[in-house]
From Swiss-Prot:
This is Allene oxide cyclase, chloroplastic. Residues 1-49 form a transit peptide. 'Hebiba' means snake leaf in Japanese. It is an enzyme of class 5 (isomerase). It catalyses: (9Z,13S,15Z)-12,13-epoxyoctadeca-9,11,15-trienoate = (9S,13S,15Z)-12-oxophyto-10,15-dienoate. Belongs to the allene oxide cyclase family. It is found in: Plastid, Chloroplast.
């Protein structure tokens, strides 16, 4: 006759004085152990079901500041840096046409015209010549540099015959994470432009960058101190 398979239930040896080779296992001990095992398995199953079917946590909202901050800047071409440089790359050599490139850089002043801020630097790609408006439409990609405060980058339509709005695509320094838009007001193309920035996503701007602007007109000029970049009339480490 085949020997019976050994039981999976472990048993302990009989204590001295007990009869038989093994001690008897009390049924209630086995039942209690099985109940504990079933309880653990049940809790695990409930946890798995909860993780599978419970709603996902909501995506946290954008924590960046939503307040709109205005900043005013004048861009003035003082004809001292061979800007703009017009590169005729289109097939039409007698008039402005699609594909012409215009790299440029000009000086930046505060909206109050009493402080030198830095420079603009970028490129315009001619998209359309508009003879009935005696002007052109460009796609512009450029940056505004503000010394130790960092820079702002923008992109969008640059119209030589009327105002336009460009997107603020980012920045560095105090402008890191900035977004919003900037209104470009052509005063005298390509020599005087007035910008109104509507910035979001950043902490409060430094007081040095805030001002009450001089109303734009063809006759506006920076103060002599700002033009001479005297220490009290320019940003620290401004780009020249």
């Amino acid at each position: 006759m085949a020997a019976a398979a050994p039981s999976r239930v472990s048993v302990r040896a009989a204590a001295p004085g007990q009869t038989g080779g093994f001690a008897k296992i009390r049924p209630q001990v086995v039942v209690a152990a099985a109940a504990r095992s079933a309880g653990v398995s049940g809790r695990r199953a409930r946890s798995v079901r909860a993780s599978l079917f419970s709603p996902k946590p909501a995506t946290p909202k954008d924590a960046r500041p939503a307040k709109v901050q205005e900043m005013f800047v004048y861009e003035i071409n003082e004809r001292d840096r061979e800007s703009p440089a017009y590169l005729r790359l289109s097939a039409k050599q007698t008039e402005n046409a699609l594909g012409d490139l215009v790299p440029f850089t000009n000086k930046l002043y505060s909206g109050s015209l009493d402080k030198r801020l830095g420079i603009s630097a970028g490129i315009c790609i001619l998209i359309q010549h508009v003879p009935e408006r005696n002007g052109d439409r460009y796609e512009a990609i450029y940056s505004f540099y503000f010394g130790d405060y960092g820079h702002i980058s923008v992109q969008g339509p640059y119209l030589t015959y009327e105002e336009s709005y460009l997107a603020v695509t980012g920045g560095s320094g105090v402008f890191e994470g900035a977004y919003g838009q900037v209104k470009l007001n052509q005063i005298v193309f390509p020599f005087k432009i007035f910008y109104t920035f509507y910035l979001k996503g950043i902490p409060d701007l430094p007081r040095e960058l805030l001002c009450t602007p001089v109303p734009p007109s063809p006759t506006v000029e920076p103060t002599p101190a700002a033009k001479a970049t005297e220490p009290h009339a320019c940003l620290n480490n401004f780009t020249n």
